[in-house]
C-alpha cells in the first residue's frame, strides 16, 4: 500500500501535526522543553522495550463488552525505517540492541548525532541533553553547504539512485547508518514561513501565534520547500519532532510504519507531561560529554546535480499544494450524537451531498477504517457513494437551479428539448431518505472496522494472483473497477484533545 508507491514522501504520504505553540523567553527555555520531551520519549521507549504498554480497548460489536486492540503499531513505530528502492521501497526493521540509542538533530540543514545511552553509564541526564541541544542551537548557517536532506523529498526511485551514489563513500555510509538507526529526528527550525505563504490571510482565519492554521500546517507538512525549511528534514525516518523559531511545535511522520492515532496520541500525551512540569532549576552542572557529532558528507558532482534536481521538483510539489481550513461553529459533534447519528457518517454524507450539488453526481471517496481489532490490522476503506446517499442527495437538490443545470449537461436530451423539474419530495420523505442513507453508511463503517470491508480482500486476491503467476483477474481490468477506485475525495479523521 505504501512501499510500492513511487511518489515523493512529503505531501503525498507523510502526515503532519501542529500542536499549540510554545512561548520561550530564552533559547535555553526552548532547549529545556526539547530535552524534557525527549526524556519522556525515552521513558516511553523503555515501556515499549519491556512490552508493558497498556492495551487499548474499544466496545465490541455487540456493544456490551470491551475488545482489545492490536498494539503492534505502537511497538514498531520507533523501530522502522523506510529505505528507498528503484522498484519499491524497503521497510527496515531495526534491532533495538543496536538502534535507538542516539537522536539526530537537524539545524540549518545540517545533521548532528547525540548519543542518549551508553553501555558504561546508562542514559544521558536531562541537564546534559539541554547542554547538547544548546551547542547545536549555537551553530551558524553555512549557505555553501549543500542541503543533503532535500534528497529525501525526491520521487522514490530517483532518491534510491541518488542514495546509491552517496553510498560509494565510507563517510556517507556512516551518516546514513546513523540516520537509519536513530530514535528520531528533531528539527530545530531557525526560520518561519512568511505569513502569506501559499495562502491569502483572512481576518476570520484561526491563528497560532502570528500565523494562521494553514501556515503552520504547511510548516509541518513540508517546511516550505527548499527556499525555507524543507531540507531541514529526513523524511525517510518515522518520527520528526519540529520546533520553530517562533515556538511552533509539531511533528511529521513516515506513514508506512503505522496509522495516525498510534503516533499522534503519543506525541500529544508526552507534550502534556512536559507542559505539566515545574520550571527547571537555574543552576546547571557543566557537562563533559563530547560535542554532538556533525554529519559531514562527501558529495560527488552527480550528487550535487541530484540535490539541485531535488530542490526544483520539491518546490514544484510545494507550490501545487493549497491548504484551506474550515472552522465550523454552528453546532458540534455532540449535537449530531444527540440525534443518534455518528459524526463520521454525518460528515461523509455531507461531502457526498456537496459533491452532488456542485457536480450533479456522487464521487468515489476514501476514508481509512482502523482494523486494529485484528492482529497486525492497519486499515480498510470506508466508501460513501451508495444508492441511498444518491437518493437523498437528489431529493435535497430538487428545484435547485444549479443541479438542474448539471443534470441537463449530463443528460442526452436533444437540442431544444426542455426538461421539466417537479418538486415531489416532502420534508418528511427527505428525512426518511436521510435516515436510510445514515443506516447504509453506518453499516459500511461498521462492516469495515469489523473486518468485512471489500478493499483488503480484493487487494489480497490481486496480489495472490501475481504471486501465483496467474493473469490478473478480470474484475481488476473492468472499467467500473477503475471508476470506483479513482478517489477524487480522500478523507480521514484523527481525534485528539488539543485543538
Which sequence ranges carry the predicted segments?
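Acyl-CoA-dependent O-acyltransferases
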Residues: 1-240, 244-499
